[in-house]
Amino acid sequence: MVWKEAVSVLQKAQELKEPPLMFTVFLASFIGLAFFFYLISNHRTKAWRGIPPGTFGWPLIGETLEFLGCQRKGNPRDFFDSRTQKYGNVFTTSLVGHPTVVFCSPEGNRFLFSNENKLVVNSWPSSVGNLFRSSLITTVGDDAKRLRRILMTFLRPEALREFVGRVDSMTKRHLAEHWIGKDEVTALPLLKRYTFSLACDLFASINNKDDLGRLWLHFMVFVKGVMQIPIDLPGTRYNKAKHAANAIRQQLGSIINERKIGLEAGNASPEQDLLSFLLSNVDEQGESLTDNEIQDNILLLLYAGHDTSSSTLTVLLKFLAENPHCYEEVLREQLDIAGSKEAGQLLEWEDLQRMKYSWRVAQEALRLFPAAQGSFRKAIKEFIYDGFTIPKGWKMYWTVNSTHRKSEYFSNPETFDPSRFEGEGPPPYTFVPFGGGPRMCPGNEFARLEILVFLHNIVKNCKWNLVNPGEKVIVDPMPAPVNGLPIKLVPHDSVYI
C-alpha cells in the first residue's frame, strides 16, 4: 500500500511538470523512507488528541501536490469539497511542509479575521517567507502594524486619487500601442505587461524599457515559485524563484541608491511614487525603513499589484464577451462618464465613484475567479474552535473556495450575475477576494483603480469576441485561461483614445 501511494505521489508530481531532478528526489525519498515515515505520521496523529479530522499525507510535501494539482487542472474547489464532504467544514491536512487546519465556512472566515493578534497571526509557509523576507506579508505584531501604517498612507484613497490621471494616461498609451488597430490579440500577456508597467511606474517610477525588460524577465520566474513545495534544489520552481528574487532586489537596490541621490539634489519629488514616499517618511518613532525593507515591500507590491490585477482583468474580459448584455450596460455607463468630460480631459477619482455597475461586474468576476485563493494564519496559543483543539504553532488556512461558489450563499453560483452585488450584497464573510480584518489586502483600492480605468478605456473603444469559446481557466498560481484568452477586437465606429 505504501509503495502504491509513493508511486501515486510521483505521478502527481509529473502532472505538475516539475523538473526531472525533483522526480528523482521524490522517488528515492519515498522508496527508501516511505514505511518509516508512515509509522511516524500515524504516531504523530494519535499524539494530538482532539484535533480536527483529516490526514497529513506524506512528510515534507503532505497533500501539497494534490492541492496544487487541483488548481492547475482548473478545479481548486475539488481539494476542499472532497474533504469537507468527508470531515466537515474544519479539517486537518499538511500544506507546503506544515500541519494545517483548513476553515471552510463564513463562520470560520469571521473567526480568523476577528482574532488576528489575539489567537492567530498572519503566517505564510516558510517557502513564501523566504521569498518575501521582511515584507508586510511576513511580519506580525507591532512590526506588521508599523509597515501597514506606512504603506497605507500611500495606498489609501485620499492618496491614490492623485494618481488617477496618471493611470488613465498610461492606459490610453498602452491601448494605442498594443490593442487599437489590431484584429486579434492575446489578452493575458498584454494585461500582464500593462499592470506590471503600471505598478513599476507608480511604485518606483521605473519606465525605462531596458530596466523594465530586465525586471520583467526575473519577475516571470519569481511568480512561478510562490506557493510551491519548498525544495531548494537546482531546477525546481522554488529554487529559481529565490535566485530571481535576489536579482530583483539587486536591481531595486541600484534604483534606491539613485533615488536617494535624486532626492538630496532636488531632482526627485517625495510624492512622485511609493519609493520616494518610503525614503522621505518616518514612522512614529522617527525611524525610516531600511533599504532591505523597502526592497522587500516593493517586491511584494509589484507581485500583488500586477499579477492579481492582470488575472482579474483577463477573466473580466472573458465574462463580458460571454455576457453581451453586461457588456452593453458597462458601455452605457462608461460612455456617460466619457460624455461628461472635456476633450482630452483625464479621468478623476470622482469618475470612478460613478462606475457602480462596472464595479459590480468586476466583483462578480472576483467571486468566480478570485486572484488570491486564500491565506495562512498561525496559532499563537492553543485554543478550541468548533469543539476541536488547534495546537499552538499550527498553521490555519482560509479559502475563497469554501464560499464563493456555494449555493448556500449565492443563488445559481455558476451563473455570471453582477446584480447579486446590488443593495446589501452577499452575506458577511462569504465574498472575501481581498481577505478581511486587520490583514485585509492593503492594495484593494489600487486594484479597483487599475481595473476600472482599464475597463473604461477598453469598452469605449471596442468590443471583443472569444477565439476559443469555453476556454478553460486554471490556477497557477493565479486564475488564467489556458491559452491566454485570444480575442478578436471589433472597434466601434468612433475611437476615443
Swiss-Prot record:
One of its GO terms (molecular function) is oxidoreductase activity, acting on paired donors, with incorporation or reduction of molecular oxygen. The gene is CYP716B2. Its EC number is 1.14.-.-. This is Cytochrome P450 716B2. GO terms for cellular component: membrane. It is a single-pass membrane protein. Its cofactor is heme. Belongs to the cytochrome P450 family. Keywords: Heme, Iron, Membrane, Metal-binding, Monooxygenase, Oxidoreductase, Transmembrane, Transmembrane helix. Heme binds at C441. GO terms for biological process: sterol metabolic process. It is an enzyme of class 1 (oxidoreductase). SUPFAM superfamilies: Cytochrome P450. It is found in: Membrane. It holds the Pfam family p450. The chain crosses the membrane at residues 20-40. It comes from the Eukaryota.
